[in-house]
A protein has these predicted regions:
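C-terminal amphipathic alpha-helix
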Residues: 67-79
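Amphipathic alpha-helical coiled-coil/heptad-repeat segments
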Residues: 6-8, 36, 64, 75
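Acidic, low-complexity, intrinsically disordered interaction modules
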Residues: 26-65
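Short acidic DE-rich linear segments
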Residues: 2-4, 77-82
């Protein structure tokens, strides 16, 4: 994945969080973040469960917010060092 592609992925993540915070679209936001997690290298991926329930999705967003952002920062630095 190129740095440009990764930055586009980050933009999707930010939009997902905005949906969750402003519109209460927790399930859709969690699905986007789940897809983003799949794009990360294996050693940076989080182990996540499928999310269909809005309460589970909200819990997911609150629980994994910092971990996913940290993994993203680590991967972006890897891409920059190539």
């Amino acid at each position: 994945m190129s740095l440009h592609e990764f930055d586009a992925l980050i933009d999707r993540m930010k939009l997902a969080y905005e949906y969750a915070e402003n519109l209460g679209q927790y399930v859709e936001a969690a699905k986007v973040l789940y897809q983003i997690n799949d794009q990360l290298p294996d050693d940076l991926q989080l182990i996540l469960e499928d999310l269909e329930n809005p309460e589970s999705a909200k819990s997911f967003l609150l629980k994994y917010n910092n971990e996913l952002k940290s993994a993203i920062v680590n991967y972006r630095q890897r891409l920059m060092n190539f």
